[in-house]
Amino acid sequence: MITSIPLLLSVLWVPILSWINFSSTFFLFGIYYGFLTTLPIGPSQLLSIRAFLLEGNFSGIAAVSGLITGQLLIFLSIFYSPLYVLLIKPHLLTLLVLPYILFYWYKIKDLIDYQSLKPITSIKDTRISKIFFDSFIFQLFNPVVLPSPVLARLLNIFLFRYSNNFIFLLSSFLGWCFGQFLFVSLGKLLLFRIESDSPILYLLVKRIIYRTFSIIILSFSLLHLSRAPVPFITKKLNDNLQFNLSKPEDSFVLTKSWPTLFFDYRKWNRPLRYIENSRFSSQSPIKKKVSQYFFNISLSDGKPRLSFTYLPSLYYFEKNLQKSSINFNLFSSNEIYEKWIKNKKNKKLKIYKEFKNRFKFLDNGFFLAEIIEKKNILSTFEGNIFTKICDPLLIKQYDKKMIVSKSPWLLTEKSYKLTKTQKTLTFSKKDNKLKKWISNQCQEFEDKNFILPWEPLTQDARRILSLLINKSKKTKIDTNLKQMNFFDENATQLLNKQNLSSIENTRKKINRKSNLNWELILNLSPRQKILFLNYLQKDKWNTLKISWKNFFLGDFTQIKNILFLLTKIIKPDQNYQFQEINKEIPRWTSKLKNDKFDVIAIGVTDIRQRKVKNLGYLIKGKDKRRKIIRRFSQQSDFRRKLVKGSMRARRRKTLIWKIFQVKINSPFFLRIMDKPNLNVNNVLKIKPTFQNILEKKKKESLNQKALFIKRTKADRFAIANRWDFPLAQWGRSWLLLIQSHLRKYILLPILIIFKNVIRLFLFQIPEWNQDWYEWNKEIHIRCTYDGTEVSEKELPEQWLRDGLQIKIIYPFYLKPWHNIQNRNNLPNKKNEKLDLIYDDTNFLQNLVKTKEHSNNLVKKKKLNYCYLTAWGFQTNLPFGNIKKQPSFWKPIKKKLKKNMFFKPYQNLKNISTKNKLYKISDVENLKNFNSKKKEYINPNLNNLDFKKKNVVITKLNNQNTLLKQNTDNDIFSINFEYKTSIYINNLENLLKKKHISIEKYLKKQKTLNLKKKLIMIKQKTIKILKKNVQLIKKLPKNLKINIQKIYINLKINKTKLINNISKFFQDN
């Protein structure tokens, strides 16, 4: 006997624990998903927080209670389908959400008086009912602001799935209550903190809160506009209205039903892509229709389970049989289920035994080829094997299936054969008992609404079928350019070319048979079937109209026909329930205009292709046809072949999260884009020596980059991509045009005038003609964004949107003077060439110089051009490296240096040599004038001596050549007869005194060249030694770093080994 409370609890604890262990998964899942429903923040949550902050605890609890009742009503709608259709289906509520939010915002946008900010203290206050009603309605609308409506919908799915599990329902309710309690307590805490921490009066704080919440609700309404489909009349619908103004019967208001009048699921609101059908075959990989989710109880392993893919045709068939009050006692259901379960178990046992025996045979030593099951295959006489799908011996074990036009679930018999005997249909000997029983029972129906497949067609149906077939024969029906919408009531459009083959088959059957049944209609394609039924229904409407007219005219015999037709038309769903329920995929069955290029402002295509930029025109052939050259934009493709009119904001994989976003990325890869920075010091813990080396290397690399950065092809493309959006192209193209006009007509003319005026002031000849000639040669050509030339005066098409480049041919560079060589100075050039030939040492060098001179002349003939940048610089290629311009002041500096330093020094040298020569010549002239007078008289000797003089002088070095030129000018001023011989003799004496000969001079030059080579070799060796010394100095530091790395890696490996060993022992 239990005498105390602890003993009672200990006794009860054991069954409670066993119950929790048994239902722990459902209990935990219920609490988790119940709590998740309170996380998504909607307008009702915002209203309750506003009520807590502005009107106190009492109004906040009223708002939360409205929120809770609204959410409870949504949960109850899962178990009651009419309430679910009203609340969860978005057709009606979508129209009401936005007007109500805007009305509420208009109501609270301005603070009229401060009495509305006073806290509520009693239930009698009228504001409580308003707050409760607002939060209740907003919760029924079920819009979610943050983070996503998925969390709210998860519980709905699980409640529907586990509605029979009491533990899940109870735990989810507990989790939901806990979440609501937490929300209320957090609201109270927020109110308390704001009241206590506010430095000013709380009434003024309330005014700020009032204003902020009105802004939040307005922003929420705008966000709802972007998410929900707006029921506006589109452009295409307007065109249809204008086209059908003359036809009042086909107006869209009368024909379209709710909710497709406002929300047509076939419109391109969703960002769906258009996929064309194959041009060569009628079979398309795209599904034309999908089966709707249909929920009903079905059997799985002999047990009743909820199936979401139950066949609707079976459900309606069962429903009609139940309505007819027939006792279906043909077979007892329990016997069928028991037999089915037994067969399944026997099959499992057989398979298990078969595998067990095979394993035993393998253990006993049999080969695998002997144990594997062997099958017979059909083959031709030639030895060719049939495919598995065509082989009757293997077709049962083949996974694939043949395409069958009929639905296997319709009540049509495949085994019977139709034979024609005196215009009647007879079945074969194999009778279908189920079919006979159903037909006998259906004949006893009072109201025969359910049509069976083997029943014959009525006269009206046969007439309409023949009319349709004759119409398709006369006019080949084509609906490639029209939109099909069969779920609207105006689906009376023509058939596609693809369905003509089935119409031909039906025509042949009509010709063969006189008695037609509904099976022929079942074999038609879905479009033809719906078209036939719509025509049949329209025919009934027309006969009803005619009968009404006759009735009003006085023919009272039409009353029976009117009543009969009205009963048939009012109940259209019960007429033809033999067809399966399916849903057409929301896509256009018609053929849209899908071209490769989407030219803006023309509207050729119905699909948004990738952006195309016009490059220009290319003239080809004798006819000189203009071919448009195009290119795709370098930007990422934000369009992705979407149909015009679709909502791009609802795309899944193309997220836009930046103001200026160059590339398009999926949100899944955003974490890869934002790479975290790695701190090397925290990971490796390196000493400051290593840090100093890294800092030095960074500084050196930065300095090298700052000197001159060469742009590669990839860099140029990257810069072009950055500029390739409309606003940037607009600004850049205007800047380029301004820069070209400034350069051509303002800057360069000013510089030319300034230069020539200064030359006049310096008493130099101005170079107007040369400068203006070079300025006129400069041509500015307008090009497209990629650099293809368009014209000198005309701009390319859409240059503000697509971009612009300006190419400068023969760019003008200002020169301090022009080096114009006189072509009349030919003898000087000839003498120079003779001198070069006589000099054996410099002969090869001079040949190289002549070749370089000829190459330069060829290069000058090539076209000189550059591209202008937006800042006035010049580049060799679009977005390439900035071109270095020749300096104006550099040649002036060189000239000044020569005039200031080199010329005075050379003049002094020349004067000293002249003085020496004059002294020597005067003395020797006095001594040898009388003795060698006879020699001077003979002119032939003088000519020979003069030639010798020239030969000797050319073989001297550069300094002696200068002396020769200066002395020749002085000596030739004296009489030729007397002074030439004196000059030659003087030179010979000088050479004898100094012992200078030509051979010695050549030897000296060779030695000098050898010395230069030796010096070069020494310099290279010194550089190599310096590098080796630096490497030797850095060796200890590098060794330290490598040792530290090895030490760290060893530590990491040790920790990994210890963890692995500990895990191994824990597992064991």
Swiss-Prot record:
It is a multi-pass membrane protein. GO terms for biological process: protein transport. Keywords: Chloroplast, Membrane, Plastid, Plastid inner membrane, Protein transport, Transmembrane, Transmembrane helix, Transport. Signal peptide: none annotated. It is found in: Plastid, Chloroplast inner membrane. The chain crosses the membrane at residues 11-31, 68-88, 92-112, 131-151, 166-186, 213-233. Pfam families: Ycf1 (PF05758). One of its GO terms (cellular component) is chloroplast inner membrane. Part of the Tic complex. Belongs to the TIC214 family. Involved in protein precursor import into chloroplasts. May be part of an intermediate translocation complex acting as a protein-conducting channel at the inner envelope. This is Putative protein TIC 214 N-terminal part.
